[in-house]
Amino acid sequence: MASLNKLQSALGVRFTNPAVLEQALTHASFTNENPAGKAGDNERMEFLGDALLNLFVAEQLYRDFPDLPEGKLTEIRVSLIRQDTLAEKALLLKLGDYLLLGRGEDASGGRVKRNNLADAYEALTAAIYLDRGFETARSFVLAGFATDIHDIKEGKHSPNFKAMLQELTQANFKALPEYEIVESTGPDHDRIFCVSVSLGDVLLAVGSGKTRKAAESEAARAAYGKLSADSHSG
């Protein structure tokens, strides 16, 4: 594992207790192979970090977009705090170089696995909060998302509903959504596509658009909204 001093310099955060930072970078595979070690793995920190990320980003969106309704704010927040997004931010910090992994996980490419990187970013957020407090953690998160939020203000950011739906169905149902063209109508130069999205045998939603990609995105948006509403009401 690379020097934690180097990581702290990159973060702009100096830990009073470096053991907290080390735990945030400790994968469960490492603790399984080293049960006598003092530090636990980072799974509980992931839980806390996820909540903190959602809080800090939601608060900033609330302040920056006073005219947007709750549903739209939720869409933007979810589109920002996704596994792929968090993994990209972890890559920028080179978190993979600092992970403590079991031998098997390391050999199988664990340092570049997107789920490991995203989990480590969540855990790192929690570690900063636990060691340095609320404001330092908030500053770290908002600095990391500053460009993303700026792009939203400039109209350069569009939620990737297909990716959001895939993450949701994988997490909750261990299955991938499937898209199918239901029909296409109109002349070749002005065709409208209608696409369905299903999970197994269950039809989730239907969307339409001038291209298949646009229709799939609209179907994914509708399906994501439906599943999110169902999970909140249930």
Feature roles, as predicted:
Residues 1-234:
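Double-stranded RNA-binding/processing signature
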